[in-house]
Regions:
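Active-site acidic/histidine proton-transfer and metal-coordination neighborhood
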Residues: 3-130
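Active-site proximal loops enriched in glycine and acidic residues that flank catalytic Cys/His/Asp
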Residues: 107, 133-135, 168-170
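Histidine-acidic metal/acid-base catalytic patches
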Residues: 129, 141-201
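A generic structural signal for short coil/turn motifs at secondary-structure boundaries
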Residues: 35-36, 79-81, 140-143, 176-177
């Protein structure tokens, strides 16, 4: 890669700055990263993209822990959630340690997809990946759990020495008062107080 030495230098400096100012750096690779896919070329491309994220974090000298998380949705259900989650766990083993040590998974915003409960029993119990609780997504894919129950289940998957990460957003439809906007779309601003239920997150 052209200018790789200069790139490494800037990334290393950025990593030092993040630690100096106590900034927690994380990433959220795009939705095309689908480790549940039954198509080998999709999985290969996913592994390549996630590896790039892990390499960048390594060049920044960030911790190989979920403190510096690389967070993804696990991908499609393909009509069989259980088989898809099993595939995800198998394909997880294709990832380098720079990714496996940082990878987290997040609950989805469609009822047909993955709730915190799905991820807990189908992924976390198999391979120990922490779950990032998304408050807004939970409204559309609750897994028959209350917000507090799902939050606390997700929190329980994190190492005890790392503050769990969560995602919080609100509905753009409500913010813009526009019924044509997908209710799952994120608002530009936060208006309500975030209920942590007494947890440090």
């Amino acid at each position: 890669m052209p200018d790789i030495d200069e790139i490494r230098q800037h990334l290393r400096s950025t990593g030092i700055m993040s630690k100096t100012h106590n900034l927690r750096l994380t990433s959220h690779p795009g939705p095309f990263n689908v480790l549940t896919s039954p198509r080998p070329h999709v999985v290969t491309n996913c592994v390549r993209d996630l590896t790039d994220h892990g390499d960048v974090f390594d060049m920044m000298n960030l911790s190989r822990t979920p403190y510096n998380k690389i967070n993804i949705h696990i991908g499609g259900a393909y009509g069989d959630k259980e088989s898809a989650m099993k595939r995800f766990c198998e394909n997880f083993e294709l990832l380098p340690d720079s990714v496996k040590s940082r990878l987290t998974v997040e609950n989805d915003d469609k009822a047909s997809m993955y709730s915190v409960k799905d991820l807990y029993y189908g992924v976390y119990e198999r391979i120990g990946i922490p779950i990032v609780f998304d408050y807004h997504h939970h409204k559309f894919c609750s897994g028959d759990m209350s917000e507090q129950e799902a939050l606390e289940m997700a929190i329980s998957t994190w190492p005890s020495d790392i503050t769990p990460a969560v995602h919080y957003s609100e509905s753009r439809r409500k913010e813009q008062l526009d019924e044509t906007i997908r209710v799952q779309a994120h608002s530009d601003y936060i208006y309500d107080e975030i209920d942590t239920y007494g947890h440090d997150i």
